[in-house]
Structure formats: C-alpha cells, structure tokens
Amino acid sequence: FNSVAIIHNGQQKGFYHKQCLPNYGVFDERRYFNTGHNQVLFDYQGLTIGLLICEDLWQDAPIRALKEKGAEIIISLNASPFEQNKQEQRKALLKSRATEHNIPIVYANSVGGQDDLVFDGGSMVVNAQGKIVQEAPRFLQHTLYVVARHDAQSGQVILSEQRKSPLALSQIAETYQALVVGLRDYVNHSGFKGVLVGLSGGIDSALTLCIAVDALGADKVYAVMMPYEYTSQISLQDAQAQAHRLNVSYTVCPIHAAVEGMRHTLEPMFSNTTADTTEENIQARARGMILMALSNKFGHLVITTGNKSEMAVGYATLYGDMAGGFDVLKDVYKTQVYALANYRNRLEETPVIPERVI
C-alpha cells in the first residue's frame, strides 16, 4: 500500500492506505501498490481529522465519504511533481473541494528533486469557504503554523490566517527554479563532488552553466572549453567571459590531437570513402571522451547541454554531446532556452550570459 502512519507521542495510532492509484503521466502506482478501501479519521484536541493521499483529493468520492463520516478538517499528504501551471490547478481544486463539502483542507506537498522529477512544495491551507489562509513558498522547505479552533456560534472549524503570502512566481521563474532544484538534488543524492560542463560559446551550455552555479555554488562547477580548428574566436571569448563572470574554474583543452589521432587510426578502414558527418562526429566524441575522463579521475558528474527540441528530432551525437549523467535542459524547448537565459540575465546588474550569445 501507499500509506500514511498516524503517530502521537511516539505511539502508532493507525494507518491510512491510499484509495485512488493514478496510472497516467509519470505515475504507475497500480503496478506497485494495492488499493486501500477504508476511510480513516482520528481525533486530536477535539478535532476530527480525515486523511487523504495525493490522488485521493483529485477524485470526489474519498473526501465526500470522510465528510459524511464526520470529518471536520482534511489533511492531504502529497508528492505532486512540478509542471508548468500546476500550482494554479492545485489551488482551483482545493477551493472547489473545500467549498463543495464545506470543510477546511491542509494540503502538504513534497519539495525537492528525485531523479527526473521535481517536487515544488507550495503547501497550502484552505478554509471551508475556499480561501487560502496559509501558503508556503515554492521550491523551498518551509513550515506553516496554523491554529484551528471550533467556532461556538457556527460550529465550524476556524483557521488562523498568515499576514503575508509568498510572492507568486512567473512561469519562467518557476521553470528556472525547478531546473535548479532538480540538478541540485540529483548531484547531492548521487554523491558527486561537483559537475563538469563542456562550454561551446553557445546559449545551451551558457544557460546550463548558470543553472549549475545557482544549484551547487561556483566552487563545485568546472567549465571546460574544448576548441578545434573550426572553433571561432568569438566562441572562445564568450565562453571565457561567462566562466569568469560566474567565477567558476575554467579550462581550455584543445581536441586537435585527439581528433587527428582517431582519424589516423581510422584512415586504413576509411580509404576510398568520402568525408561526411562521420568525421564531424569524431569531434563531438573526442569532447565526450575528455569530459568522461575528467569525471572518472576527479569524481565530478558530467552534465550535458542538449535541449528538448534537439532531443525530439535526434539532433545530437551519440557518445558525443550526449555523453554525461544528467541533461539539465532535456525538458526545455529551444524557445524556452532563450527565455530562461534572458530571465537569468535580468537577475544580475551585469548579465552573466554575454548578450551576443543570446
């Protein structure tokens, strides 16, 4: 079962098993869990509290059954992953459920990254009239304190209200924060000492470097520029400028010898053939080999820089620019990359990404 335990003063008082198991999107709970069938209520300091877990709240039957059995307030425990506009959907749902059943709801959500999922927090408390009376900030661990009491005249549960709500995040701001949290927790949970970013002088690697610094701190980010004979002077200048503005370790490692060595090795087998993308891909694979060698030697995670648009059409080199352990921009379209880069630049008096890169 997907369950919650009720514990008071060190004593286990009971369990609630989730009733509605989602099987859509990133969820596949019916494969792993059995379905719960019973409503669970418990009394605490004169309040009768009903429990729900995540999807239970998105279906009407569980909360209706709790209300009919005498619940005066609902606590809903959630591991609801981030997606754009999801917080507005949650708020609309909570207001609808609270007003329809005339019952306050405490909505607690997980925060942090887990592999390729990000949980954005934003826990809330809604009164029986559907008003949000307490709200936690997004993407941060936070504790809300709410006082619930019986009103002698109406018999309803009255909730205390916070004085100031957290600032709402724009869509681009919440997306950026999700990328930062996702990378931070993946690296920390995996035990890596830091991350390696292969810079090209382009916008994808520039944005990835910013996210890495914001997630881990400049002292744990290592930028490597690996030029070849076709690399422009502008690309070299822009990569160096960004690394210096973000105060990260910056190394230039030319790949000419590695590429020519591989071409020389392949020359007998490539005789009587015409040069094509095969030779071009050797450059990307030489860069991937260098980054992975640095990763093995120093214990840093290689983060790749391909965006969702490139992944969708296969615009990448297998064992080349795809070589790495985590792709920060894998769910970000190229158009969003530009928007995110401009957003990050607006956070600083001096843009950290050179304007001509954008």
Residue ranges of model-derived segments:
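Short acidic (Asp/Glu) and glycine-rich catalytic loops that position anionic groups and cofactors
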Residues: 76-77, 157-161, 217-222, 242-244, ...
